[in-house]
Amino acid sequence: MLKVYLSGEIHTDWREQIVTGAQDLDVVFSGPVTDHAASDDCGVAILGAETDMIWHDRKGAQINAIRTRKGIADANVVVVRFGEQYKQWNAAFDAGYAAALGKSLIILHSADHAHALKEVDAAALAVASEPAQVVEILRYVLTGQLP
């Protein structure tokens, strides 16, 4: 069984495309909480309200980091998606963390981001532009079969 952590942007259905495409493979997927409000507010919901947004955000970030660290540590493969909009600092951090742990890293982004992400891409074992390519990488890793 291959354990795959899906990190990165939360505004498109790329995760669902990969999970659906890999449903016939022996893969278990995990990832961050993708409900933006729940992710932002988990700290204060669990540990209590804060009057200052800095501490509100810090509590959430730290609890989310526990989940992220465990997910990446447990994974055999980490896929990090950089989407078309927003500054995706969390995705970049997750990619660096996974690389530092020696995880097999697949980066997913459009050609428009190739220059900006060249160092991140250089740390990856594969750089894909479509979720279907990630599925085919997983299929090849598990079965040795080409598309």
What is each model feature region?
Residues 1-147:
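Conserved catalytic or regulatory cores that recognize and/or transform ribose-phosphate-containing ligands
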